[in-house]
Amino acid sequence: MEDYDLVIIGAGPTGLFATFLAGLRDIKSITLEALDYVGGQIPELYPEKPVYDVQGIPKINAIKLRDQMYEQAKTFNNRIELNSKVTDIIKENDIFKIEVNGVYKYNARAVLLCTGIGDFTPRKIGCEGEDRFFNKGLTYTVKDTEKFRDLTVAVVGGGDSALDYATELANTARHVYIIHHSENFKAAEKTIDLARKNEKITFIVNSSVISIDGGSKLESIKIKNELTNDISELGLDALVVAIGHVGRANIYKSLPLQLSPNKRGVLVNSKLETNIPGIYAAGDVASVEGEPANPLIAIGGAQAYQAINYIKKYINPQASFFGGHSSNLKI
């Protein structure tokens, strides 16, 4: 068993920044990632997506942002272990025993959960033909817009991901349709405006996809107007379903964590503490009492900073809460 001050679970954006901050505060940490890559949702869901809401960076490709976060996380040589799924956590006295892939490997004085929305799968439309045409014209993510060059594409959804996909696809596709069951979109105002101004994007609102058709690959979809019940057919080369993901917080059988009402997050107080002393959470997994959910990289980063400072005080009560300015360090 190896001993650490802190085990960080998850190497998405929040976990990577927490790794850097732990090094900044001289906290001996190890970061455990279940997947074989870092970055969490970025490489899996939107590697080609431009990111605009990180302080000081007007625009950056998501995968490039991930790479820069990874480089920053390695600044102090704190360990990051991939293919390391935490399968259980046991608290004995003031020490947490961390089980990885079924084997107890690490002891830690504190744990920081940065697991995002946990194990997740794309939310499906639930219509006829959806499973049949998966990877045969139907996809739930856009990892490479070049694969859609000169194709006629429809994107189903009304959130930021759907409209961002549509705008990016318009750069390579012949034409893009956005299909949404309502007239009201959940995306940011500027995201909606950008899509509406694009001549290669057509909005089909108050409508739902009821079937997906084709031969060896997707060729068309049937759309039902929710107001008139009229059914129409739309010829397509590709369909992107972007209506969210079904997530659930990782559950550790020996750790009675208090979950949020929707079971997708862990309840924390204003100090990012869970109901178990020594266990903290930051990022999408953290459901802060009395606050709305803010699934943003910037919010996760701020929470990581706050959590690491509280963890420093937890493992060393004599330490100052604020560790000073990084600009004062020669790193």
Swiss-Prot record:
Enzymatic class: oxidoreductase
Binding note for cofactor: Binds 1 FAD per subunit.
Keywords: FAD, Flavoprotein, NADP, Oxidoreductase
Keyword GTP-binding: no
Annotated GO MF terms: ferredoxin-NADP+ reductase activity; flavin adenine dinucleotide binding; NADP binding
Cofactor dependency: FAD
Catalytic activities: 2 reduced [2Fe-2S]-[ferredoxin] + NADP(+) + H(+) = 2 oxidized [2Fe-2S]-[ferredoxin] + NADPH
Binding site for FAD: T14, E33, Q41, Y46, V86, F120, D284, S327
Record-listed E.C. numbers: 1.18.1.2
InterPro entries given in the database record: FAD/NAD-bd_sf, FAD/NAD-binding_dom, Fd--NADP_Rdtase_type_2, Ferredoxin-NADP_redctase_2
Transmembrane segments: none
HAMAP family registered for this protein in UniProt: FENR2
Entry's family note: Belongs to the ferredoxin--NADP reductase type 2 family.
PANTHER family with a match to the protein in the record: THIOREDOXIN REDUCTASE 1-RELATED-RELATED
Subunit structure: Homodimer.
Official protein name in the record: Ferredoxin--NADP reductase
Biological source species: Picrophilus torridus (strain ATCC 700027 / DSM 9790 / JCM 10055 / NBRC 100828 / KAW 2/3)
